[in-house]
Amino acid sequence: MKTCLLWFRNNLRLSDNLPVYHAYQHYDQVIPVYLYPTQNAEHPTGNFPWGKHKQTFVAQSVAALGQLFEVHGCSLLVDENEGTIVERLCALAAMYEVDAIVGSTEPAYNEQMEELAIDQWAAERNVETHWFEERTLFEQHKLPFELADLPQSFTPFRKKLEKYSQPAAVLPEPTLTPSPVRSAPWTPTAHASLDQRSAHPFQGGVSAAWDRLDHYLWDTEHITTYKETRNGMLGADFSSKFSAFLALGCISAREIYAEIKRFEHQITSNESTYWLYFELLWREYFQWIARKHGRDLFLQGGLQPAKPKKNFRNKHFDMWKNGTTGDPLVDANMRELAATGFMSNRGRQNVASYLVHDLHLDWRYGAAWFEAMLIDHDPASNYGNWLYIAGVGNDPRPFRKFNTAFQAERYDPQGEYVNTWLD
């Protein structure tokens, strides 16, 4: 009998999941496992511990996946041991004497290095490794260009995909076989109470992801006004709020795309329904940017050579992250982040610009703080957007400074948002 270790990373679902599909189609025994991430000691800005809301959302999503396995008579092993991801995964593979390791490949540099190290360990022991792309709408071999020729800016990328490619089809959930290794259901310990002001009052997990999608598309049809409302900052429905579920893979981009197309076919299509797909394409672009550029995504100079260096002043950074800069819009957004683990896209652009262009700090500290605090943190999107604001990304216009007073006047003219978080 052939046995594989099925490693879950940021693909915490059973449906439309290539590693899951492959494992249960090709191996007699499957051991599903999730390894709680360790802090990255090589991070250029050091380590900020995860915020309590991120801890809670991740824990809820992992527990929800475990419950799905229990329904099928299986167990999800949740490993919280000390050591690196590579050490812990290889130790499990050795302990259970598996024939293969099956998992999702990640686009960011550190995760790519993990995969290479696991490949090396496995090759020395005649263990197969199989990696599948799970973050993207499109399969790499079906992109209308080689990765090395990825367009330098978003618009030509989007136009080529829309002209020459189609997102991959959604995969069915395979028939699961009972796990050869049984364990008691994992119970999360992280729990953060919900702030009633939160624009993201949702739990993590597959069921919560589909509940949100059904609400936003089918129950309320809010998708039909998405383009007009997406720059809001208060309330749950000004935007889709799919990002946290996408970041952890509680739902896939392909599943969301399929539901958008079904909605357009059965209900209506307009500029707003297209715009939600447009935003999925922005996310897609950052995934491939991360895979192409690797470690450069995390360097101060980003994708551009010889950019001037920024300083790091601890006092100014603390004012920024604590929401005490004296700029009402910036402070309100940073306090929302601390209280909920979420911030609107409009808010993220403003606080990022303020850190880089007003406080003149190294953008990587802001990106690292977002990484620690955001429940929807995705390395490719987070660091890609920070590079963009800092002027060291693919599209290197040097000065993307947001006038926060003008932004507040335009997007919060009555001061409702600022008053909500500063009162």
Describe the function of each predicted region.
Residues 127, 148-300, 408-423:
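Glycine/tryptophan-enriched, flexible segments
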